[in-house]
């Protein structure tokens, strides 16, 4: 049987149509596979909440030890349980409107500079009182070399701090180092103490001022004295004020700490009634 032109055209048309249908069917199957693959990969690339190092974990209350090499994350976090009775700690200041030239706040009822022996009964009752609040100001050196011992010593002596118990510095009611302790200053680096015998070769990246409650009889005034001392050190030695969470201190944070003092005093009055 011989094919004419008409028959050949019909055969070719059938082949072309079949090819088009086959190609369309193949594309549909291939498209579904690619879509599934893309969806699977999109879910596979989603970050794992438990393993992503960039995700912040919920805040926890933990004890932090002071590290030998200090950077922003090495500043100590002080809690009431960690600090000795003599510790005094407090608020933070970054936008604080305390000018360096402003007079340091004075306490009510200043004490005599002459040495005085504390009454045993008062001392025992003070030691028995548990620490409820600890207010902290960290002063971090901007220079990688840190604060040099001689300059640091001169600065804090001018602010009325004196070397004493636990081998750290304390600010008493009297500039001569007498009277009750208002607040203290420790080395922010391990072991947290100072060695006056080697002060010439001493340096530290940061120091921590702290005020404990219950503590001084006039905590609000004591707090202002501590803020002034920390600001003076930061201004004159090139430091930055940070709070107990290692954040730059702001005026709002300072006010928050003052409010904590007010709340503490209110609780004390309620307990005495």
Curated annotation (Swiss-Prot):
Alphabetical keyword list: Cell cycle, Cell division, Cell inner membrane, Cell membrane, Membrane, Transmembrane, Transmembrane helix
Annotated function: Essential cell division protein that stabilizes the FtsZ protofilaments by cross-linking them and that serves as a cytoplasmic membrane anchor for the Z ring. Also required for the recruitment to the septal ring of downstream cell division proteins.
Region (Disordered): 65-125
Gene Ontology, cellular component aspect: cell division site; plasma membrane
Chief place where the protein resides: membrane
HAMAP family for the chain: ZipA (MF_00509)
Spans through the membrane: 2-22
Record organism: Ectopseudomonas mendocina (strain ymp)
GO terms under biological process: division septum assembly; FtsZ-dependent cytokinesis
Protein name: Cell division protein ZipA
Pfam families: ZipA_C (PF04354)
Protein family: Belongs to the ZipA family.
NCBIfam families the record matches: septum_zipA
